[in-house]
Amino acid sequence: MPGIAYLGPEGTFTEAALRALDAQGLIPATQSGAGSVTPLATDSTPAALAAVRAGDADFACVPIENSIDGPVIPTLDSLADGVPLQIYAELTLDVSFTIAVRPGVTAADVRTVAAFPVAAAQVKRWLSENLPNVELVPSNSNAAAARDVADGRAEAAVSTALATERYGLDTLAAGIVDEPNARTRFVLVGCPGPPPKRTGSDRTSVVLRLDNVPGALVTAMNELAIRGIDLTGIESRPTRTELGTYRFYLDFVGHIDDDAVAGALRALHRRCADVRYLGSWPTGETGGAAPPPLDEATAWLQRLREGRP
C-alpha cells in the first residue's frame, strides 16, 4: 500500500482530505477504495514533501490554497525549491472549526487558545466576539492544537471535530468560521512521472523564474492570453537568493495534452529563465474556460504540410 505523508497528527483536515482522495480513487495505483493507503503523519507541510523527496513516502497530501487567506505559502515554497515534485490530484473540502476544551472547562475558564495560524485567521472575528482577550498559542496543525489542550498547554483549541474526539475533549462550540463557504484545496504530490490522463476538466501549474528585463512578466502572460488559456491564479514569491528577485506561480485551466497548453509551455520554456512544471491533473469541476481546440489556422497549416491546401 502506498505511504502518504500528511500534516499530522491524526485528526487534521489534511488527513480527512487524504482519506477522501483515497475513497474517490484519485491516488495513483490505488483503485480499491478507502483503506488502500498508509497515512504517515509529519510535523509540517514541508516535512511531508521532504518525505517524498527522501523516498520515505510515495506521495504527500498538502494544503495549497484556502478561500480566506489564499495560497498556503509553505506549500508553494516547498514545491519551488529542491528536487522537482509533481501534482497528481486535488480535492477541495468545506472547512469549519470546533472549539475543543478539556471536560469541565467553560468559556469563562479559557485564557489561552491553541491554534494553527491558518485556522486562527479563519476564526479571528468569532474569537474576538466570544473569547475576547485570550492569548493565542501557535500550534503546528489543527490536530496538534487539540493535543496541546489534552496535554495542558492551553485551555482551548481551534481544532476539528475528529481531533476533538480522538483526544477525549469536549466541544465548547462547533461549526465555527468567520466567512460562509470557507474552503481549502488540497493536492496530492509525488515524484515526477506521466500526468493523469486529460479529462476536459483539468488544471496545470508552473513556477516561472523571469529574466530581470522590462516587460518579462507581460511577455510570459501573453503566451497564455494569445492561446485563449484561462489563468486562474498567479502568486509571486521571493527567490530567497537575491533581494528583488521573484518567482511566479501560475495556475491555469487545461492539460499538457491540450494543444493550446502544450504550445504555451513550449513558449514559456523559450522565454523564461526557468520553468518548473508542477503537473496537469483533473479537478473534477469546471474551474474556468477550457482551452480552445486545435484552431483553424493550425489545421490549415497541417493541410499544407500534407499537400492538401
Swiss-Prot record:
Could you tell me which cysteines form disulfide bridges? none
Any idea of its EC number? 4.2.1.51
The pathway to which it is assigned is: Amino-acid biosynthesis; L-phenylalanine biosynthesis; phenylpyruvate from prephenate: step 1/1
Site (Essential for activity): give the residues: 184
The record's catalysed reaction(s) read: prephenate + H(+) = 3-phenylpyruvate + CO2 + H2O
- Transcription as a keyword of this entry, yes or no, is no
List the record's Gene Ontology CC terms alphabetically: cytoplasm
- First-level EC class: lyase
Q: Which UniProt keywords apply?
A: Amino-acid biosynthesis, Aromatic amino acid biosynthesis, Lyase, Phenylalanine biosynthesis
Q: Domain (Prephenate dehydratase): give its ranges.
A: 3-191
Q: From what superkingdom does this record's organism come?
A: Bacteria
GO-annotated biological processes: L-phenylalanine biosynthetic process
One Pfam match, given by its short name, reads ACT
Q: What name goes with this protein?
A: Prephenate dehydratase
Traced from the root, the source organism's taxonomic lineage reads:
Bacteria, Bacillati, Actinomycetota, Actinomycetes, Mycobacteriales
Gene this chain is encoded by: pheA
